[in-house]
Amino acid sequence: MDRNELERIIREKLQEILGAEKDDTFMVEASGRHVHLTKEHVEALFGKGYELTPAKDLSQPGQFAAKERVRVIGPKGEFSNVVVLGPCRSFSQVELSLTDCRQIGVKGVIRESGKIEGTPGILLGVGDKYVQLDKGVIVAKRHIHMTNEDAKRLSVKDGETVKVKIHSDRPLIFDDVLIRVRDSFRLSMHIDFDEANSCGYTSGMTGSIEK
């Protein structure tokens, strides 16, 4: 068992314990820069018939970090070795922090995942193969994944925005946190590395909705 798998199991056990002790507390996870690809773009970058290789399960059921990596190339710079998340989607999307966007010269547009109309494009590369996206670069709006049962218990609904208190050595309250409800989800809040740095993020950190 590798370290990432062990951390995932620990997070799940902590969630069970915290859920039993305090129903309104949930795990907070920090997401680094990453890419979602369509099947067409996977084949364009890695070869015809190519399938992503799962390397690590993510906290959301069925989602995984793939072994494959890409270059994200902007007007003023690029990031190499950017992780691809699977499975393939119906649209390609690049998720960066605002700091990342400034570094490579791309406009940072804060959006819910999947809401890519009107967002900047970017060039993706693997070796001598490239894919030009005409849209799809977003700064992910901070959000909480939950089931319908979780939403009922926490008195929130899909698409609502809430305030979340972060329990850490640098406690703060995040405003405008999006609620995303689907029964295939597992309860957890997702923030990016800029947000994680602002609250002194550590693995296993928790949050709760402020009423």
Curated annotation (Swiss-Prot):
Keywords: Acyltransferase, Bacterial microcompartment, Metal-binding, Transferase, Zinc. Its cofactor is Zn(2+). GO terms for biological process: propanediol catabolic process. It catalyses: propanoyl-CoA + phosphate = propanoyl phosphate + CoA. Pfam families: PTAC. Its main location: other. CoA binds at A30, S31, G32, K76, N197. GO terms for cellular component: bacterial microcompartment. This is Phosphate propanoyltransferase. Involved in 1,2-propanediol (1,2-PD) utilization within the bacterial microcompartment (BMC) dedicated to 1,2-PD degradation by catalyzing the conversion of propanoyl-CoA to propanoyl-phosphate. GO terms for molecular function: acyltransferase activity, transferring groups other than amino-acyl groups; metal ion binding.
